[in-house]
Amino acid sequence: MKDTTPIYFHSATYAHEHGELDQYRASHKANIACKEAIEQAIADNYRDNRLGPACVQQVLQQFDYGRIFYVLANTVRQKDHDGRISRDNKAWAQTVPVCEDKDGFGYDRNVYFVVDRCNPGLTDLFLSQARRECTPVQEQKPSVRDSLNKNAGQQAAHSNKTKVNKEQAR
């Protein structure tokens, strides 16, 4: 059964101040479960120095791409110094919004959902595979920005034709 808990994009402090601790805790718990699912999938699908193609699908049975990418972006950011993670994936991780979440002592709560039971190189391979598999899904859905730009371009072309027709009529 797929976890449908929404990702909570704020810190525990914010959640406490706004009476949203239940949502924060549920999301944090789901992040940890997703991290564990990723680690298990890598362990199950790594054979003969290869990460099997079913690896990402195993995690997708439990979580959607949003949660998987949130956990992986957090992991890559926490391991930014590690040379076994590609520059491309490090750059990608910076584009995913991950909330900074420090406790009263300054300790980062996000470390609880860092994929760390497997080699960072395997985590990098998993992330690359997940990004490749997700791309066709995203290409099927046009972005809102592209749709708006396309409509604006069509409207501009239509208004230019109207101006030309009015000028020709004069």
Each language-model region and where it sits:
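Gram-negative host-targeted secretion-system effectors, predominantly Type III and Type IV
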Residues: M1-A169
